């Protein structure tokens, strides 16, 4: 039997041993503060959708995400709207608006209207990819980047002239945009303005006598009195003139002509038609704004009257510094550099033993939708072939398709050959 004194001695020895062990562990395992940890960024894996290499996220809206991408055939920089069918079904008129936008954009070609380059569809994942020409920034993003929320007069004038050019083209094609606002005006690196988002636009019937419309889904702050007051019918073109007037008011003053705590109060104020123009706008701009924001649509300026106005025709001096394109909100990159470069590096480092990248290997094809009054591509080429020699067209870096559907095979042979050629092409691009 052990005596208490011997048990105490053994206990003290055990405690001493554990203490020595803990000191040893501290010496063996180097303890560092969490702030000293350097986290290795996750390697970006390349993903190809058809012939397009995906880049980083550019933005996200109610309809889906917008990402940058690179055309592996032409090496043109593109933007893509990624639309999920499940999400579109939850949005009122979501699928119908997207289909309408595709139908309209397919027949439009103008410097100041966004161009649709391609439409891809993944049947298994129920995804649609709308490939558009790339724009570096949105006008609303530029306005939000400065404290007073407006452009210098000369800069606003340049953008407004381009807006009128694009709007005149849309109207000449019988299209009412219905949602002109800074948030739907995009800009390229050289300052070219592009009218975008034709989801709520309306194509007038080719044989319609006027521009009468009956529905509107535009942004409330940019709607005219006839819509705010709930009229059954209204002039579609004059709605766009009013919205362009509110846009001009906003980009020159940083304010809105009509405001309200809620949509009901806002529409009440718009319906009355009472607004004021800041004195710093000057007499010429004030007169143009009053003409575009005329309560009576019949007296409201037409595009021809806007073009003939002295403020529109005047050459405005560069007195204030220009509002530049702001840095990217995600990466803070002031140059808005190509975001597909890390993915190109991933392709460049590919070896035969490695799994190359994620590849949308399901059925992906270009979709065509018939537009009222539009000649189908097959019929068009059949007609032109009999009267003139065939000629391959190239629209903004994309070749015209003779078929309405282009399927991508899921066989391993196609993947090996096509993907291999893309790797060689993109790797050569990176080395240059």
UniProtKB/Swiss-Prot annotation:
Protein modification: Phosphorylated by a cAMP-dependent protein kinase. Autophosphorylated in a reaction that prefers Mn(2+) to Mg(2+).
A GO term, aspect molecular function: p53 binding
Residues carrying Phosphothreonine: 192
Enzyme class: transferase
Reactions catalysed according to its record: L-seryl-[protein] + ATP = O-phospho-L-seryl-[protein] + ADP + H(+); L-threonyl-[protein] + ATP = O-phospho-L-threonyl-[protein] + ADP + H(+)
Tissue: Oocytes, eggs and early embryos.
Compositional bias (Basic residues): 422-432
Principal subcellular localization: nucleus
Subcellular location: Nucleus; Cytoplasm
The protein's name: Serine/threonine-protein kinase stk11
